[in-house]
């Protein structure tokens, strides 16, 4: 009986243990039987698939009712149009991750066996927002397709998706030919890239005195170098690590031996004949060279890797096989390296990689690949916040820092900052006033290289009438933009207004130069002294004072400091006044004088005289007027005619003494005083009636000193 009860208790304990969750090594289970070293913690409930999709949804996409499947959510484009070639991923395959955690073989091989529809099923079963992308009902409705790159699932746009359209899954059409995203080439291309990167890293870590015949180190044992080499590959395409490649394929083994490529290398053996023939070197004029096959179009090895490949200090340069005559050339570009020269010689610095579209040459092949995106329009770097895409990784990183408000390259001379070192260098040319980029045909210099490239296109145009003549004056213009700016001269339109003073300008560049007068910014500094100027023409005129350059007038020989002042000076000799006033017709030689004159026609005259109240538009005009109110200093008396010829009139001041007389002796007033009233009708003249017995001397005395009117009461005294 007791034995039965013990068996019953042991059965209950076994049942209870079976219901409890199994503990693994990650939860602190001790295999020696001592128990758990760490207890279980409360795990919060996992979020639903819709919540995960909302959290991982890129910018420019939104969730909404699907038109392909009723009562289901779909992914809609609500931002900028999605261009073909846009790539999202790698996707997190939910089923594969669960099976991998349980120790079961993943179902990627099963999906691959099902063909392209297996990838569609895997995309629908992913754990991100791509699980809500519905299938299209017809092939014509599909615009996105699942693709695999190095056995990792991605989602790619293969048709233009306009705003307001739903993203619908459909396998990528096979008529587009082999591409990087198809499963047939991604594995071999990834193996080729890892082989290339590993060999370059092995050459880098090898010592200079190492024998070339010694096999290179196994890449599996150099994990830090392998990680560094993997990071050198462009982030546009993420390839698996060396461990994953070694699991899916045979061990790579030594790649270089006795200076030749190992013919038994598994990576080379796995490559198809097209890739093997394309990995051959383009021979240099001296007959030697080496190359490594790049993964595919768009894979950009780092500049540091290309520099190592071109370095003459490499001690184990591989020699590639000669391509077979009948081998088919594929679209994979090659990385070629100059042969190592003698000791002490510098590497070749020629720009050997030339663009077939525009003829621009580059030092490194990776730079040529980046430049090719300009012509193809391929922009693999997509901003998930605003939806803008870039073809350059440097510009993309600077754009992402701009969302955070970070500009890591400030200008040391002003308060501006930039996101890239290239933009900062172009800006610093503005402070120096230099124009380092000169046209080799006409000699015109520019401060920026893009401006020079645009200028060179004007020389490529044949000598023919300009396609954009002005309909008003017939002047030929280069393009429509120049014509629009020119038409503002005829229409008088000035669309660019200054927010500080309200002054209008025809061109935006003139407004920017004018705003510096308000902000006090002086970016143009003189290289000879400490002066700075807000506009570049002012700096050029100032530089003449240091160089001693002068412009002589051909008429009078006067030296002027700039051509603008010389032209204005020549108008003084010719009598030309090309700036007339539209209101009164008065003309001037300079536009600045005309603008100053136009202010006199304004009704508002803020500068008024405190004495007489007369108004003026300019302060200098008011100061000139106030000089007329100042009392004149006493001066020498003018000569007077003889008293015998005509009577003499003398004005008396406030002092009792007389200031001027017609004789040397003092004149005394007579007893007879005649009062005369002078009116305006007599034209500022008065007549004193003559008496036959009166003396010829008369004295005029003002009754009230200081009056300016002519209607005054004066006293005329008869001298005895």
Curated annotation (Swiss-Prot):
Zinc finger C2H2-type: from-to: 353-375, 381-403, 409-431, 437-459, 468-490, 496-518, 524-546, 551-573, 579-601, 607-629
A GO biological process of this protein is:
regulation of transcription by RNA polymerase II
The entry's localization annotation reads: Nucleus
Q: Where is this region: Disordered?
A: 201-350
What does it do? May be involved in transcriptional regulation.
Q: In which tissues is it expressed?
A: Highest expression is observed in adult retina; abundantly expressed in the fetal eye. In the retina, it is detected in the outer nuclear layer, especially cone and rod photoreceptor cells, ganglion cell layer and both outer and inner plexiform layers (at protein level). Expressed in retinal blood vessels (at protein level).
Residues modified as Phosphothreonine are 322
Q: Where is the composition biased (Polar residues)?
A: 275-285
Q: Where is the composition biased (Low complexity)?
A: 287-296
Tell me which GO cellular component terms the UniProt record holds.
Answer: nucleus
- What GO terms are given for molecular function? DNA-binding transcription factor activity, RNA polymerase II-specific; identical protein binding; RNA polymerase II cis-regulatory region sequence-specific DNA binding; zinc ion binding
Q: Does the keyword Repeat apply?
A: yes
Q: Which disease is it linked to?
A: Vitreoretinopathy, exudative 6: A form of exudative vitreoretinopathy, a disorder of the retinal vasculature characterized by an abrupt cessation of growth of peripheral capillaries, leading to an avascular peripheral retina. This may lead to compensatory retinal neovascularization, which is thought to be induced by hypoxia from the initial avascular insult. New vessels are prone to leakage and rupture causing exudates and bleeding, followed by scarring, retinal detachment and blindness. Clinical features can be highly variable, even within the same family. Retinitis pigmentosa 72: A retinal dystrophy belonging to the group of pigmentary retinopathies. Retinitis pigmentosa is characterized by retinal pigment deposits visible on fundus examination and primary loss of rod photoreceptor cells followed by secondary loss of cone photoreceptors. Patients typically have night vision blindness and loss of midperipheral visual field. As their condition progresses, they lose their far peripheral visual field and eventually central vision as well.
Keyword annotations from UniProtKB, A to Z: Disease variant, DNA-binding, Metal-binding, Nucleus, Phosphoprotein, Repeat, Retinitis pigmentosa, Transcription, Transcription regulation, Zinc, Zinc-finger
Q: What is its main location?
A: nucleus
**Annotated source species:** Homo sapiens (Human)
What is this protein's record name?
A: Zinc finger protein 408
Q: What SMART domains does its record include?
A: ZnF_C2H2
| InterPro entries, per the entry | PRDM17_PR-SET, SET_dom, SET_dom_sf, Zinc_finger, Znf_C2H2_sf, Znf_C2H2_type
């Amino acid at each position: 009986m007791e034995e039965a009860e013990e068996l019953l208790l042991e059965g209950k304990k076994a049942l209870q243990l079976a219901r409890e969750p199994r503990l693994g090594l990650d939860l602190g289970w001790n295999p020696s039987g001592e128990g758990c070293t760490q207890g279980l913690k409360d795990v919060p409930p996992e979020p639903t698939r819709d919540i995960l999709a909302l959290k991982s949804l890129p910018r420019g996409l939104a969730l909404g009712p699907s038109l392909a499947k009723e009562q289901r959510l779909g992914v809609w484009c609500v931002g900028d149009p999605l261009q073909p070639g846009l790539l999202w991923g790698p996707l997190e395959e939910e089923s594969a991750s669960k099976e991998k955690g349980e120790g079961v073989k993943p179902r990627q091989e099963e999906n691959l066996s099902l063909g392209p529809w297996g990838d569609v099923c895997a995309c629908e079963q992913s754990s991100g927002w791509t699980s809500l992308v519905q299938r299209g009902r017809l092939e014509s409705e599909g615009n996105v397709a699942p693709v695999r790159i190095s056995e990792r699932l991605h989602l790619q746009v293969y048709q233009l998706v306009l705003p307001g359209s739903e993203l619908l899954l459909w396998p990528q059409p096979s008529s587009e030919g082999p591409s990087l995203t198809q499963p047939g080439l991604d594995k071999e291309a990834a193996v080729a890239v890892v082989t290339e990167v590993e060999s370059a890293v092995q050459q880098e870590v090898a010592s200079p005195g190492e024998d070339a015949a010694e096999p290179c180190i196994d890449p599996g044992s150099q994990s830090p170098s392998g990680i560094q080499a993997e990071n050198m590959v462009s982030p546009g395409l993420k390839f698996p690590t060396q461990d994953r490649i070694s699991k899916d394929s045979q061990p790579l083994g030594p790649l270089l031996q006795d200076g030749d490529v190992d013919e038994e290398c598994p990576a080379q053996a796995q490559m198809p004949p097209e890739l093997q023939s394309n990995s051959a070197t383009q021979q240099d004029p001296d007959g030697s060279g080496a190359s490594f096959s790049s993964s595919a179009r768009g894979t950009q090895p780092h500049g540091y890797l290309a520099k190592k490949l071109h370095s003459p200090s490499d001690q184990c340069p591989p020699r590639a096989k000669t391509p077979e005559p009948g081998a088919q050339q594929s679209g994979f570009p090659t990385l070629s390296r100059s042969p190592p020269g003698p000791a002490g010689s510098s590497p070749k610095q020629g720009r050997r990689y030339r663009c077939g579209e525009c003829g621009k040459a580059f030092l490194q092949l990776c730079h040529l690949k980046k430049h090719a995106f300009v012509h193809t329009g391929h922009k693999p770097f997509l901003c998930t916040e605003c939806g803008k895409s870039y073809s350059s990784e440097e510009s993309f990183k600077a754009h992402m820092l701009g969302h955070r408000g970070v500009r890591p390259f400030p200008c040391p001379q002003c308060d501006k900052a930039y996101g890239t070192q290239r933009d900062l260098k172009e800006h610093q040319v503005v402070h120096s006033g230099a124009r380092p980029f000169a046209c080799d045909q006409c000699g015109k210099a520019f401060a920026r290289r893009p401006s020079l490239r645009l200028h060179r296109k004007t020389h490529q145009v044949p000598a023919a009438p300009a396609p954009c003549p002005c309909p008003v004056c017939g002047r030929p213009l280069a393009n429509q933009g120049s014509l629009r700016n020119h038409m503002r001269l005829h229409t008088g339109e000035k669309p660019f207004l200054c927010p500080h003073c309200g002054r209008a300008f025809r061109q935006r560049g003139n407004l920017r130069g004018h705003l510096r007068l308000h902000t006090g910014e002086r970016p143009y500094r003189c290289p000879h002294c400490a002066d700075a100027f807000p506009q570049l023409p002012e700096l050029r005129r100032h530089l003449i004072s240091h160089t001693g350059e002068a412009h002589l007038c051909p008429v009078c020989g006067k030296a002027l400091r700039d051509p603008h002042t010389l032209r204005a000076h020549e108008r003084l000799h010719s009598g030309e006044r090309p700036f007339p006033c539209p209101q009164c017709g008065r003309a001037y030689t300079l536009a600045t004088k005309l603008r100053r004159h136009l202010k006199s026609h304004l009704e508002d005259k803020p500068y008024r005289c405190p004495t007489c109240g007369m108004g003026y538009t300019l302060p200098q005009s008011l100061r000139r007027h106030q000089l007329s109110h100042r009392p004149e200093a006493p001066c020498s008396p003018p000569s007077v005619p003889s008293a015998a010829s005509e009577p003499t009139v003398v004005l008396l001041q406030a002092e009792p003494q007389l200031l001027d007389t017609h004789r040397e002796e003092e004149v005394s007033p007579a007893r007879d005083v005649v009062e005369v009233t002078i009116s305006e009708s007599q034209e500022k003249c008065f007549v004193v009636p003559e008496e036959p017995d009166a003396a010829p001397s008369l004295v005029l005395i003002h009754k009230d000193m200081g009056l300016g009117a002519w209607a005054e009461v004066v006293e005329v005294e008869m001298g005895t």
